[in-house]
Every structure is written in structure tokens, then in C-alpha cells.
Amino acid sequence: MTIPELPLGGIVSQAVELGAPYEPPLTPDHPEWKVHVPAAAVDKKDQDTPDNWVRRDPRILRLTGRHPLNCEPPMDVLMEYGFITPPAVHFVRNHGAAPRIPWAEHRIEINGLVDKPLFLTMDELVALPSITFPCTLVCAGNRRKEENMLKKSIGFNWGPCATSTTYWTGVRLRDLLLLAGIKSPEQGANFVCFRGPKGELPRGSDGSYGTSLTYAKAMDPSSDVIIAYKQNHRWLTPDHGFPVRMIIPGFIGGRMVKWLSEITVTEVESQNFYHFMDNRVLPSHVDEALAKEEGWWYKPEFIINDLNINSAVARPWHDEVVRLDANKPYTMRGYAYAGGGRKIIRCEVSLDDGKTWRLGDIQRFEKPNEYGKYWCWVHWSLDVMTFDFLNAKEVLLRAWDETMNTQPAIITWNVMGMMNNCYYRIKIHPQVDSDGVMGLRFQHPAPVELGERGNMGWREEDNLVAQALAAVKEGATAAAAPAAPPPVVAAAANGGPRQYTMEEVAAHNTEESCWFVHGGKVYDATPYLDEHPGGAESILIVAGADATDEFNSIHSSKAKAMLAQYYIGDLVASKPAAAGATVPEPQPVASTSSPAVDPLVVLNPRQKVKLPLIERIELNRNTRIFRFGLPSPQHRIGLPVGKHVFTYATINGENVMRAYTPISGDEELGRLDMLIKVYFANEHPAFPDGGKMSQHFESLRIGDTVEFKGPLGHFVYDGRGSYTLNGKLHKHATHMSFVAGGTGITPCYAVIKAALRDPEDKTQISLVFANNTEEDILLREELDELANNHPDRFHLWHTVSQTNSSDWKFSTGRVTLEMFKQHLFACSGPECLALMCGPPAMLEHCCVPFLESMGYSKEQMIHF
């Protein structure tokens, strides 16, 4: 967004641009500049997202990709501003796009168990009596990354900076409810529910975010619950709820609904999807599956409201090194907070594993409200001498509140990764710098970013070690080939692991030398290319790049543990040159396999390409063809027959990647067609959430874009019976037997269609296609047409689990060996090939053993 030219310069607030009453533009010399530091432009990361109009500070650390925005500030930025955090660097938790709401159009409806329902405009709201006070907001997931390093929760990785403090201005909720004539609990008014705009989010019956308070909390004058419209004395920004939001001091941020649209007084708590499926701390033994199976989400005792006690160290920060050339004063710093209005009374540091504790100095910025409640964090400091760290292995921090509660020593995992408040524990590592001076490096548990020296947090390192040990243990029980020796990692000059910059990694992007980055570590996957189950291209697609998101989206913990044997060093931002030396430019490794670039081919195995949706074709209740436009009518996909593509999306804050085979090929110019069966939420008891990516496709509107990457896959049908495996092994088949289950038909269909299209292709083809019902059969008309047009070359057989049709002439029930023998080719030699795609259990327990009994070797079976 371009900031309009102003006579006196300055940045106009986005609230004013959306019609809020005038407030003067901000300039660096304005007295309010420091408590706002407004972003001047739209960040390039937000271009091509629904938030492409929201101005954001580029310093924020984005935790869930580009969209939606979930971010926290770096610790040094958070602490730099002191007690009051500028909104531009205040942490943000968004479940979706920030809605663009004009001031004049917004209304707040107050209804339910009230005598006088209200329908307030913003002008009417701000005309009511208001209060202003400072309040610390905290996401319940603050410090979640530490939990995720023990065991993955269902939440993304918050670091220790999901907390911020600002002044809030608004109308007391109690006053509004009294104005509306709220009924009493005796009359059924037990809860006050809040929700944001309808249709804002993909989950829930109305697509809104909502939650509730008890009547007692909402009406308690000591709780200072307000309907806020200003932050640090200026109108709210879009990310913080403009034009209006809830502020509930002492509560977790997840209860403070942004873009507030409706307040409803009810007899029962909010029935909103997010009220139940978010912000809970379940017992440690309850995982996601058990929570769904046994209804743990709906048990009221596990809801989170009040914040717990928590604290963190800001100095020394992660990867900081304190030189020990002299015994010098050093000031440690950090923050602490508590919930429920409780006062922080102690911040303590231990340098001897908790045997003794040193009391820090507390800087308290607020006075309590008239009821004695404290709503803000404190900052603490502790003066030590640098030699005090010399015999310490760890720094421990804990805080106490006025009820004499403190933080637990040990972390407790829960499925949502929420409310982690164990001791803040920093490891201390001795090291010698390039000048030969002894120093100590501090390693925090799980910071969002790598440190300035390229190191990850110690809990992350522990996690990698645990995965490697699990892999070794699993390998030992397999009693297979002798174990390979542990990897030898070349040492850097300082004795640590070899360090590489991203430029050096990028030079290794070929089959001859294939490196990639995962979680700040560098891996050489070259030896594994031929062994990868998905073929070499599945790795080469990320060669020379950071593969963290793509790897995590589709790999299990077992696969992650296998990384250890290919580890070669750590990723660093840059490497200092030796005195008088120059850093040579990395030289790319020569490749003999790089294809020439065709300007009319869309897919690029090295980069994601973004394509717009141009048409939706509804086939039945849950099946669609999504047609995406290519850059011109002359462009083609560039997808060899048998290969597939990856699609990418950020869904509810999670980076999701799925493999699909388009049903259009290179012969259909100007478009890419995806056949998608939508797995809706709450339809199958075993999968109550439905399919993430298929529901994302369902939410697309014409003009929306999807990112694609490819081609990839280990099998290519070259035509006339010839095929290639892993880009190297060229073979020929005279008979091809296909087995497909459900949506697994798409790669099979691509090969069958290509073979039958060529009149010179004499390959004999059979297909057994398994589905649940007749209505579930995808591409039925297309397959029937191919079978009718090529009866001498293509035999088609269906089986369904159930049917009500008296005209059904095919099988009923699961696939059987007898069915395979009747409708597929027995293996009579090396030119017979079996190709399959479907549910893993069907392939593993039925297809593979049946085909083996028909003479097929594992080498003659292709798994798409």
C-alpha cells in the first residue's frame, strides 16, 4: 500500500483510512511514535494473500508461513520498548484473514437474555463512558515450542515472546450489559457469549470465532472486562481487532474475541466450535485421537481462562557469548507475569541446579486497580559477575505470585501444547573464540530462530538425539543388515560441526550432489536418492533449499529420525573470513541431468508456481473438478505420464502439502484439471475433521490461487509399453495390471488414458477399481468410454462395498485373490507389470500378497 502524501508527512492510521474519526498522522518526532512505531507499508510476504492491504512491521517473526498471520517479536525488540509494547510488534494470533471492516458499517449486537437488546454503531459505542488501563496479553501457547520438542502437539511453535503489554481503552462490559437490561442467573443468564464476524473462518457452523464468560466474571466490577476500541490511546489496528474487540485482563488471549460483532447472554456456555476445540489443557495421556474418541474437548474442567505464572530470560539471549577475559559485572534481565490479577512478588535465578536461588530486582510499572488487582507483567534484573557463570551448567529462572505459587521445575506435555510454564532453563557451554579467549555460550530451550552463531535451542537438539536413538532402537530390532557406522561430520576450526551458508547449500542441487536444510541443519541426501520410496525426484525437488516445511508436512517421526545419518553440519547466516582471506563464491556442481527449460512449460521442480482457479465443475455431492488456468492458452503443464504434483496451503496456521495427480495432461493446453473428492468434517466418525486439503479446495473461489510444485514421482510411462524407473532404469511391459482404490484412480487413469490414446500402443491393460459405493466411483464415464472403445486392449472391473442397485453387474465386497485372478493378468514373465494406488492398508494387506501369489515380484509392482 502506498502511504498518501501529507503536507506535514507522517503515517495515517489504517483505522482512519477505514473511516474512524480523525487522529493525527504519526511521525518519528511525534510524542506517541515510540509506543506505536507504525508500519509504513505492506510487507512483501503479504502480497498475494487476503491480507495484502494490512501494513505490518518486517521485524515480526512469522510462525505459520505467510498467511494467516501468527507472529511474535524477537526478544530484543520486545524488551527494547520496555513496559509498553508498540502495536506494530505486539504478538498476533489470527485464525484467518484480518477482516476489512469500515467503521461506519460495523455494528455490535447485544441480545439473548436481556430486556432491551442493543444494536450499537461504533460512534454510539465510543460516546459511552470509557476507561483506560495497561494490560498484558499472553497467548496460551506461549513457550509451546519447548513442548513440541518433547512430542508434537497440535499447535504451532510459539517461542517465549507471545506476550505484550499496551494501554487499552474501552467501555466496561458490565455497563453495556446493564444498559441492555441483563437478566439474572435465577432467570437463566449464566453465560455471556462473544463472537466475531460470521463466515470469517473455515470451521464451525457459521464460520465465526466465539467463546464465553460466566455471568459472574462478566459482571464483576473488579475484573475490568472492556469492549476496547483503542490501543495505546489510538484506534486499534486491523491485526488487533479494528474496530472493536474484547479485553479480559488476566485471561488468556484466546478469550478476547477480535472484530467483535455479537454479545449474547445465554443459559449455557458458548457452543462455538473454537470455544471447545481450542484453549484446553488436557491430561498428558490424552492425545488427539483419544480426545476425539472420548469427548475430552467438552469436559469443562479442562478449559483455560486465567493465565498461570510464567517468566523468561531476555539477557543473556540465545547464542550470546560472555567473554571471560576478566571478572566483570553483568546484568541479567527478563520478564514475568501471572494471571487473575495476582501480583508477581519474586523472580529468582539459580546457577547451581536449584540448590540456591538469587533474588532479582523487580521493576513494577503499574499500580493495582481499586480492588488490588495487577494486570501487567513485570521486568526483572539481577546483577552478577561473569565468573559466577563459570561453574554453572545451567541458568534456572522461576517466578512467584502473591498466593505463594511458583513455576514447576519439569515441563508437562499436553496435546495442545498450552500453558507451558516450567522453569526457564538455559544451558551454558564453554568455548574459545578466535582470539583464544575463554567464553561461555548461552543456549535457550527453544527460540523461534537460530541464534546469531547458527545454533538451535537445546530442546531441539535433544529432540534430534531422541529421534536418532529411536531409529537406532528400531533398526536393532529389525535384525537386518549390519548397522552403518555413525556419520562422520567434518569439524570446523573451532571444534564444532562444519558450518555452511545457504549459498553453499544452494550449490548442491543435483543428483550428483544433493544437499538440503531441515531445522537449521544441513544434510547430504545423495546416498539416499536411489533408496527413497518416492523416488529421487521427491528429494531433488528440494535440493539446495530449506526443506523444513515440506519435509514436516509429509514425513513421520521415523523419517525425521533417519535424517541423523545424513547430517553434515549446521546452517549459518554467514561465516567470517580469516584475516586477509576472501570468501570464495560457491561453485555449483556440474550436472548431467538438468533438462533444458521450456518457456511454455509451467511446472518447475525447483520452485512453486501459483495458478488461479478459473472454473469449478460439480460432479456430485462431494466431488469436483477444479480447473486452474495456465499463463496462456499455449502453455502446458509439463507433467510426464505417471508423475504427480504437490499442492501447498496454509490451513488454520499449519503448512499443509499433499500429492495429487491431475486428470489433464500436456495435450490439454492452457489448463490444469484436478479431480478432488472433498472429505467434509463431521461425516466420518473415524475422521471428524475431514480432509484438510480437500476442504481447502472446496473453500476456493474463482480467482483464488493454489501453489503447485513438480513434477515428481519415480515412474514415467514413455509410451508403447516402455517405462522408466527413477529416471535411469528403462523397461518394457506388454501387460499392465492396475488396482485402484477410491481417489487412487487418478494416476492409474493418467497412464491408461495415455496408452489407449496411441493406436500404435499394443499394451494390454486391466483395471480392478474398488470403491465404497457406486456414487463414489470417480471418472466412471471416462473409464467406461475407454473400455467400450478399446475392448481388445482394456478390461475394466469394479467392486463396491455396498450397493442398492439391482442392475449392478460387477463385484460386491473387498478385493479378493479370486477377483485378481479373474480380472488381472497373471505374471508370465518380466514384461508384466502391476501398478496400484489406494489406501495403504488395502495395498499392503491385500494387493501385494495377492499379486505375489500371481507371480509378480516386488520389482514388478509400482506404487504410485
From Swiss-Prot:
- Which InterPro entries does the entry mention? Cbr1-like_FAD-bd_dom, Cyt_B5-like_heme/steroid-bd, Cyt_B5-like_heme/steroid_sf, Cyt_B5_heme-BS, FAD-bd_FR_type, Flavoprot_Pyr_Nucl_cyt_Rdtase, FNR_nucleotide-bd, Ig_E-set
- One Pfam family here: NAD_binding_1
Q: Which domain of life is it from?
A: Eukaryota
Cofactor dependency: FAD; heme; Mo-molybdopterin
Reaction catalyzed: nitrite + NAD(+) + H2O = nitrate + NADH + H(+)
Supply the alphabetized keyword list. Answer: Disulfide bond, FAD, Flavoprotein, Heme, Iron, Metal-binding, Molybdenum, NAD, Nitrate assimilation, Oxidoreductase
Give the UniProt record's GO annotations in the biological process aspect: nitrate assimilation; nitric oxide biosynthetic process; sulfur compound metabolic process
Q: Which residues form the FAD-binding FR-type domain?
A: 606-718
Q: What class of enzyme is it?
A: oxidoreductase
- CDD domains in alphabetical order: cyt_b5_reduct_like (cd06183), eukary_NR_Moco (cd02112)
* Binding annotation for Mo-molybdopterin: 139
GO molecular function terms noted in the UniProt entry: FAD binding; heme binding; molybdenum ion binding; molybdopterin cofactor binding; nitrate reductase (NADH) activity; nitrate reductase (NADPH) activity; sulfite oxidase activity
Residues where heme binds: 532, 555
Residues involved in FAD binding: 658-661, 675-680, 687, 692-694, 746
Q: Induced by what?
A: By nitrate.
Q: Where is the signal peptide?
A: none
PROSITE patterns referenced in this protein's UniProt entry, alphabetically:
CYTOCHROME_B5_1, CYTOCHROME_B5_2, FAD_FR, MOLYBDOPTERIN_EUK
Which note does the record give on the cofactor?
Answer: Binds 1 FAD per subunit. Binds 1 heme group per subunit.
Using the record's annotation, list all stretches that form the Cytochrome b5 heme-binding domain: 497-572
Family named by the database record: Belongs to the nitrate reductase family.
- Function according to Swiss-Prot or TrEMBL: Nitrate reductase is a key enzyme involved in the first step of nitrate assimilation in plants, fungi and bacteria.
Subunit structure and binding partners: Homodimer.
Q: What is this protein called?
A: Nitrate reductase [NADH]
Q: Record the organism.
A: Volvox carteri
Quick one: which gene encodes this? NITA
